[in-house]
Every structure is written in C-alpha cells, then in structure tokens.
Amino acid sequence: MEKAEVLEDEYQHLFLKPLLNASTLLITFQGEAEALTVSINEQGEMKKVSPPQTSNLTFYGNQTEIIDLLHGDISLQHLIQSGSLKVKGSFRALLKLEAILWLTNGFFQRILKN
C-alpha cells in the first residue's frame, strides 16, 4: 500500500488536527473505467486501499473531472453543484473532505503519482 502524509508541516497540522478524529475516513472515487479508494487516518496519513464494502464517501462521475479534482484544478463544490459529480455518503464526511481539500490544496497529487 502506498502512503502519503496529508500534514506536510506543523502549520497545516494545527488546522487539520480537529478534522482528523479517531475514525478513518474512507473515500472512493468511481470513474467510468476504474475506482480509487483512499483512507485518511487520525495521524494524517493517506494511503490507497482496496475498495471496501462501504466507504464514508463515494463519488461517481467523469474520470477526467475526478482527476482534475484530485489534482486541485477544480473544486469539489463546483463539480457537485454542476451535477458532474454525484456523491453518496454522509454530509459530515463531505464537509470534512471539503475542508481537507481546501486547507491542503491538491494533496491527492502525491498519492496519485505512486
């Protein structure tokens, strides 16, 4: 399994620590051809995992737009509002992910390269 640190420095740690509670956040991105599932634990470690039975959040949409989202080129809110991306999961988990994406611009890039 590939692992990347969400928290690059102490400064980010101060902002993200309240978001990273004791439970692991499982997020699945399902495109037309393939799916990517990542977990983010309470230490801020993010790693690719095999798709679980259930994720906290599952995103369905166009593969290209999902990649743009993960690279930080387009906002999650924009894709959801335009209807390009469908979301299944809790509102709390969605808000948590949106906050993490906002505070760590494009942090998924590190895990996609591996």
Swiss-Prot record:
SCP2 domain mapped to chain residues: 21-101
Q: Which Pfam families match?
A: SCP2
Taxon lineage: Bacteria, Bacillati, Bacillota, Bacilli, Bacillales
Q: Which organism is it from?
A: Bacillus subtilis (strain 168)
Q: Which SUPFAM superfamilies match?
A: SCP-like
Protein name in the entry: SCP2 domain-containing protein YusD
Xref: Gene3D superfamilies: SCP2 sterol-binding domain
Q: Which InterPro entries match?
A: SCP2_sterol-bd_dom (IPR003033), SCP2_sterol-bd_dom_sf (IPR036527)
